[in-house]
Amino acid sequence: MHVLNILWVVFGIGLMLVLNLKFKINSMVALLVAALSVGMLAGMDLMSLLHTMKAGFGNTLGELAIIVVFGAVIGKLMVDSGAAHQIAHTLLARLGLRYVQLSVIIIGLIFGLAMFYEVAFIMLAPLVIVIAAEAKIPFLKLAIPAVAAATTAHSLFPPQPGPVALVNAYGADMGMVYIYGVLVTIPSVICAGLILPKFLGNLERPTPSFLKADQPVDMNNLPSFGVSILVPLIPAIIMISTTIANIWLVKDTPAWEVVNFIGSSPIAMFIAMVVAFVLFGTARGHDMQWVMNAFESAVKSIAMVILIIGAGGVLKQTIIDTGIGDTIGMLMSHGNISPYIMAWLITVLIRLATGQGVVSAMTAAGIISAAILDPATGQLVGVNPALLVLATAAGSNTLTHINDASFWLFKGYFDLSVKDTLKTWGLLELVNSVVGLIIVLIISMVA
């Protein structure tokens, strides 16, 4: 019966795509119809299905909704105050277009390493859109390399939760994960961020409406470059500082609680938003009504994106509750292939099925560890644990689709169709993942 659930999941995903692409049904409605179909076909009783839907919607949006809203407000204030224009103009004037691409990759790597991915994306998106507008190039030509860098850093490197969990599961040396991770990251980002866009054809898309200034920007009253770049960096500064402070702080002490409260994603974003109220608003001579108008405009514009992300969470949770992850793991564990490829493949399949990066990685880690662990020594046999971490992490950073919140975040923020999102977000993640595995295999042969 569990094997049959794979068929129901495929049917549900196909149904959503048909409703959205052929019949032009709103993505939120199509996702909910797909979730209901999968749950009922998989034999879930109606009350369990109702609980799953509420859990999927609530758990997905619990923290993410706050992050998305605060990030959208910061982005709107950056545009309306001219801060985004100041950043774009300064970078292009000093670096030129060639090095601007490199700069957004570096910023993406830093944000992806320091923040949860959703926070990193929300901070990156308005920057790359305005820089691209200033350079008169399609914004996706900068968005793709920036996002490729952020997702790679987020997936491969501690202190992000997925890599940390894998390091613990495999007993890997964290220093070697960083060293090998750099070797994996560079070609992955080059291929997904710089080479892939050359093969994607026309990337020209209109600027998302909520990132257009409601009124002409006063070019004589722009924030300085330093102030303009400081605000989007505030969450990264706070979170990096928290990570460093935790090296010395004792867990559950008052000092630890205060630092980790401030360093949590919602609070760090809230602090950045309040600073934006001042530095992009009142400090530039705008009254509080001007600031609140920007706030309300951003919230209204991002509302549908949030609802669609929540509906995607419903489908994801419904799929997870069918037990499909365990089914895929059981089927794959009977193969006789390289542990690196096996770890990557199991993670990819479960990620595709469930939309859960950390869950897919940890499921693969459990299966692989059981297969190659020496019970006498407690050590993995015949593999490099650090490379196994990276192979599994690369599998979690792969092609995703309608059951993944990040898919809908990319689609909604950049105002793309489902088809265009699969072509851009989907392919950049797939290239990232495949190149990552290839580099891991090459290192395993020479290290």
UniProtKB/Swiss-Prot annotation:
Role, per record: High-affinity gluconate transporter with fairly broad specificity, including low affinity for glucuronate, several disaccharides, and some hexoses, but not glucose.
Membrane topology: Multi-pass membrane protein
One Pfam family named in its UniProt record: GntP_permease
Residues annotated as transmembrane: 1-21, 29-49, 55-75, 104-124, 127-147, 176-196, 225-245, 261-281, 295-315, 330-350, 352-372, 375-395, 427-447
Cell membrane as UniProt keyword: yes
Keywords: Cell inner membrane, Cell membrane, Gluconate utilization, Membrane, Sugar transport, Transmembrane, Transmembrane helix, Transport
Pathway(s) the chain acts in: Carbohydrate acid metabolism; D-gluconate degradation
Gene Ontology biological process terms from the UniProt entry: D-gluconate metabolic process; gluconate transmembrane transport
PANTHER family: GNT FAMILY GLUCONATE TRANSPORTER, HIGH-AFFINITY GLUCONATE TRANSPORTER
The protein's name: High-affinity gluconate transporter
A GO cellular component entry from the record: membrane
Periplasmic side stretches: 22-28, 76-103, 148-175, 246-260, 316-329, 373-374
GO molecular function annotations of the record: carbohydrate:proton symporter activity; gluconate transmembrane transporter activity
Similarity field: Belongs to the GntP permease family.
